[in-house]
Amino acid sequence: MKQNVERKIPDFDELLGLWSRSLIAFPDGVEDRETWVNWLQGPSIYLDLRQPPAGPTFHTVRGLRDLNEDQVLWLAEQEGFAGTLNFDGTYFEWRREIDFQPEAIYSDQGKLWVEEDKMVEEGKDIPYFEHWHSEPIGRAPVCAMRLESKADQVRGFLLRVGSLFMYARDRFVGFPESDSARGMHLRDYVAGAKDLHAAQDFVNCEISQGAITSAGWIIQRSTLPFRLAQNLMPELLAPAATLVTSDTSHDGRQARRSWDIIDIEGSTACIPGAEPARLVRQSFV
């Protein structure tokens, strides 16, 4: 007779780091093993990027306005989010403050447990199972920032764990609000946009992942293909409440973006220009 084995629920310290997904499976038998999915978890702040395989080429794209209709439609199939992870004793909830897709009808909640060489996630509001695998990137240093750009009223996040980072910058335009629009996919907004510029604006939400090397903070994956191989160049400015990062203008010119730091988790010593700081959580509001 098979005995029930108590599930090992991970704590936040065990979740710290990079997780890759190998499978999502639904009760009707539909599975996905092809989508590239990485989830980077900090002390509570997280970022997540999901990209479909076999996209079009973007070799001639220097900025947002270079994207053609087919490229925009493919970009609209991506997913990604940034926010904070919470746990109520039963369910983990990935609260999304930035979402590449329009706001979902259902919350992003699920159970997590460790099973042999993987971590399993079981959805709460939507029935699914996901298999996650811890990637060896190192667990220190750790620094996470919640950001706000007052110049254009957009939110952002920066998270470093070990030798890897993820960065998010919200879009500058909102989605049309109506009861009929609830639950729509980004591809629907893109397909129904009044012109190509409006469609481009809908996909102009950056969620990037990269590696920290001797050459800098080099972007290796991004929802915006023209950001690939660029150096994020984060710099913490005195009095340690302002962060500057690289950006790309709509026409492909290199630019710098200034952020107000709203919240910090971890040590700012791992951010260029920063004074060493102990591992603490700070808030500037």
Residue ranges of predicted features:
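A short, structured loop/turn motif at beta-sheet edges
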Residues: 86-92
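Lipid interaction determinants
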Residues: 1-80, 92-285
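Phosphoinositide-binding peripheral membrane targeting modules
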Residues: 83
